[in-house]
Amino acid sequence: MTELYIGSHLSTAGGWNALLERSHEEGGTAFAFFPRSPYGKRSKALDPADAATFGARLKAEDYGPLVVHAPYVYNLAGKDEAKRAFAIEALAEDIELLTAIREAGQEVYINIHPGAHVGQGTKTGCQLISEGLNQVFERTTGVMVLLETMAGKGTECGRNFEELATIMNGVKNKANVGVTFDTCHVLDAGYDLVNDYDGVMRQLDEAIGLAKVKAIHVNDSQFGLDSHKDRHANIGQGQLGIPFFTRLVNDPIMAKLPMILETKEQTPATHRDEIELLRGLVQK
């Protein structure tokens, strides 16, 4: 097996250099961050002029693909036209910021929660998400957008592989859209990763295609199968458990993807310890 590309979701406080130092401290070879506040305001810590230099540093240090996380506030499936227009405009701006990193030779994706239909129905919600992405891609196609697998709470779209496939099929520029596989969300949505790992992967391949999966959010689950709760647990301390993560990091397809921890930092060393734990599960 090759070395895992793995890290956590990091703070951007202090800018690009501080972001990379945090990754070094936890022993990471991949990481995620918000390009602006999770609530939508532009982050002043990240200077677009320095993005290319940052990308070149990552490339030189052999980092795996970055998996930047779009703010939670974006809702491409919403009924509020002003908020939806903001999400489209802001996502395009985020992609433009990240394009300089990719052009420096460093692979980078932007991950989004597909959206919540807020009572309009799943069909309408999925159509709105596809239309929103089409508008984004009319402005910029510099970075691939990854749709995150969702746990299915509330009116979330993307609660199963078929809904994600519907959204992707509605996007004109299909080469510019992929998927982030969130381990907690997939279990919570009703896919039995613990007892039927191979079966779940077959369903994913049939609905979307494994080649479209570009990143993994590595989280254990507090509540487990079909709970639709979306509550992350630390690695090995939830309903997925160490046997599942052993299977994941030894899967010849999935283990090649950047793995991002979104688990709670119980101590300053939590993510370093989890990175070491997961690397230790790889069979030599």
Curated annotation (Swiss-Prot):
Zn(2+) 1 binds at H69, H113, E148. GO terms for biological process: base-excision repair. Gene3D superfamilies: Divalent-metal-dependent TIM barrel enzymes (3.20.20.150). It is an enzyme of class 3 (hydrolase). It catalyses: Endonucleolytic cleavage to 5'-phosphooligonucleotide end-products. Binds 3 Zn(2+) ions. Its EC number is 3.1.21.2. Zn(2+) 3 binds at H185, D230, H232. Its cofactor is Zn(2+). Zn(2+) 2 binds at E148, D182, H217, E262. This is Probable endonuclease 4.
